[in-house]
Amino acid sequence: MPKARTKIGLLGGTFDPPHLAHLVLAQTALDELKLDEIWFIPAFRPPHKRGERVSSFAHRLAMLRLAIRGNKRFKVLTIEKEKGGLSYTVETLPLLRRKHPNTHFFLLLGSDNLAELSSWKEPEKVFSMAQPVFAHRPRTEETLPTWLEHAVWLSNPRLEISATDLRARVRAGRTIRYLIPETVELYIRKKGLYRRE
């Protein structure tokens, strides 16, 4: 009898910083889609952030590892750092598929990504290699293009937390408590991240 395909959720992003909405999205996908694991993939050089200040890969990786600590079914992959250059999903997925041939990949995205899909590199090719899965985000357009009609929607809570807002709160001296794992909050404070941008 052939071995069942492993079901892996992929959650890519800048994670600057990782926050509770990322973790809730991942856990919801794990439970609702009956996935084996969630692999978090921090972008090495995010192409959509060119010209913006982004924390070092080392800081973002450290925060992500702290954020998922304690959940054995959450893993962090550094594949985009190993690949080098700009981090394009269309280039990362074939590498993962070669390394893990008996795996069904689910690409996890917030509905806020729908507005940006046209700027992705070869988006239709991306979603031919992985099942698109969308999580609801507050105040975002949720109309799918026809080539994405096979997408799955999660029934996740709509948490209004964004990394942009978290960085602004830190810069303004406001609390980020309960919006981010405590370990990540302590790391941000210890390293003095986001005080100036």
Where are these regions (language model features)?
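Nucleotidyltransferase catalytic core that binds NTPs
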Residues: 1-197
